[in-house]
Amino acid sequence: MQNVLVPYDGSPSAERAVEYLINFAKVFPQLKVHLINVQTEAKLYGNYVSPAMLEQLNAGALDHAAEINAKAAERLKAAGILHSCHEVMGEVVTELVKAVRQHGCNTVVMGTRGMSNLGNLVMGSVATRVVHEVPVPVLLVK
């Protein structure tokens, strides 16, 4: 576990995953962490919203994702852990599979439950899908 992808949404469960890695890095200081926050694209049907408005909504979602990632990045930086932040639009599991391949990650460390855009606890089903679809080991942190 040297190059780790962490799906991060700011939920208590995701915070525990970051805390786990901070402690892990005390023993394995060569750890590299990729924080990723995946936002769902705004999709509105009909002629109610212009394409420019949809672009603004998506840009706002990515800005929000960067703010969320920044909180965990501060903790990783304070612990001296090499890290990078990634904010993407798309379907969560699909984007996580892409990120694992793109960044050469050999492990995914994630919480068992997270927050949806509406504040509902939904990551349990996402965690299950990640375990089945990501081509590397997945460590779930309770």
Predicted regions and their residues:
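Short, hinge-like loop/turn segments at secondary-structure boundaries
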Residues: 51-53, 102-104, 126-127
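Glycine-rich, Arg-bearing micro-motifs that act as flexible, cationic patches
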Residues: 3, 107-132
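A short acidic, glycine-rich active-site loop
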Residues: 53-67
